[in-house]
Every structure is written in structure tokens, then in C-alpha cells.
């Protein structure tokens, strides 16, 4: 069978991944899937004759699927090893990180815990907001794919782990919800800082609790919807 990379990712990002692989000089077929059932179908049909790469997906790859692959699967994390878990850009902005980037690592049953096989980093621009940082992280991730393209396309050979470990606390949905909640007496400067870190979207916004009621910040105008750092549509109001 021909070499195949199965890309578990939103459809909007397939083209970017394929471009990065070509830029890195790799010749390999890329088959996009965006659901667990579609991935399981590929596993049955190909019986391990492919490499799985996941990016910007909320699909949880179960242990029995990973075990059936015949070799390591890889996840492209949109943040550096210092920011494992959800929404790394938000926490990096909130904490004033000096640099950011992307990480390619082996997948296992626990999120962002597998061996790291590739890193791309860049300096954080001053005053950057979440949408801009997510776009830079996407570009970083595609640079990393291009750099490792030939190794990714060599399906039978696992990528060599780097002597780098994950650090920092793995952020969860609960942590992000706490970041989104602002105190009633927040200063204008602190509000602007938190807004830069969190941004706005169809599924999240800054919130505040007043007199026992929770209020949600309404977006200004038609905010764009972003998938993995790439603008895809305007949010419906």
C-alpha cells in the first residue's frame, strides 16, 4: 500500500497541512478525517499502513485506536511545551510569556503528555491579542510540519524524540472558564489585558457575576470565527 498520512483535523486546515508537507519536500497522500468514526473506518481498512497526525481537533483518540496503528501517532499542539492543555495562547498572553510556538509530540491516552519530537518557537510581540497569536501559532505549526515533512512521510520510522519535557500546568476547560470570569471591580487596564487574552467567539466570552446573576460580554459587530488560528467565517449575532 502507498504511504498515507491520516490528518485528524477540521477540514478548513487540510490545505495548509498539505502545503506545508509539499514545502518540506515530502510526497505522501493526505487523507483528512474529522470524526472518531471516520478514523476508526480508516483503521479497519488500512490495518496500520498509515500515520495519524492530529491538529486543532477536539476528537479524543481512544486507546484501542492508538494501539491499532502499529506505530506512534502524533499531535500538533498550537503552543510550546511550557503551555500544555487547552487554549495555550490565552494563558501565554495572560501570563505575559516572552515566547510562544508549536509542538509536535507522540499521542497517548493523556492529553499533551507524549514524547516531544519537534518544536518551533518565536518571540511574543508586545500587546498581542489572542486571534493574532493563534494565527502566528498556526504559521509556526506549519513551519514545523515543513521542517519534519520527510520524516513524517517515512511512515514505518518513528520520529526521534527530543531531550525536551513538557513543563507548566496542563490547562483545562475549568481553567479557561476561570480566566473568562472577571471581577466586578476590574480596572480598565486589567479588563483590556484579559480581553486581549480571551477574545470573543460564538462559544466563549468574558463573564461577570453581579448580584447573583452571570452576565456575558456581547461581541462587537460580526466577530470572525477562527479554526486553529485560521479565519473561516463571521459569527452569527
Where are these regions (language model features)?
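One-carbon transfer enzymes
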Residues: 1-237
